[in-house]
Amino acid sequence: MKKVKTVSKSKKEFITGVVHIRATFNNTFVNVTDVHGNTLCQTSVGACGFSGSRKSTPYAAGKAAESAAKNAMERFGMKVVSVIIRGPGFGTEAAVKAFQSCGLTVTSIADKTAIPHNGCRLRKKRRV
């Protein structure tokens, strides 16, 4: 049987990237992409080992962001990021601070939370 030589993939370096933070009331998702929007690494608070009501805390969001930042720095050599925040969750500020404390340079922070301009009709009010 003939031995097949495998050529290792060249390690791509992305010095600049975009961090998408989606903070819901129950969870926080952190997605690191390149400038074109291709996902490089992603994580969530639940994937970092938090469960239940601890998932919605700012501390948990900071830990998830720290995990994503270390992953992006080690695997892709990322140094400069731009942050895009979506959602009304509590973990957004802690996640941004975690990226800064890991040694990444944050160039811009944009809040792109979708706000309805009197869109769909709300559910009826609860009468207790």
UniProtKB/Swiss-Prot annotation:
Pfam families: Ribosomal_S11
An example molecular function term from Gene Ontology annotations: rRNA binding
Gene3D superfamilies to which the protein is assigned, alphabetical: Ribosomal protein S11
InterPro entries: Ribosomal_uS11, Ribosomal_uS11_bac-type, Ribosomal_uS11_sf
Keywords carried by this UniProt record: Ribonucleoprotein, Ribosomal protein, RNA-binding, rRNA-binding
GO cellular component: ribonucleoprotein complex; ribosome
Stretch forming the signal peptide: none
A GO BP entry: translation
Summary of the function given for this chain in its UniProt record: Located on the platform of the 30S subunit, it bridges several disparate RNA helices of the 16S rRNA. Forms part of the Shine-Dalgarno cleft in the 70S ribosome.
Subunit annotation: Part of the 30S ribosomal subunit. Interacts with proteins S7 and S18. Binds to IF-3.
HAMAP family: Ribosomal_uS11
Family statement: Belongs to the universal ribosomal protein uS11 family.
Descriptive protein name: Small ribosomal subunit protein uS11
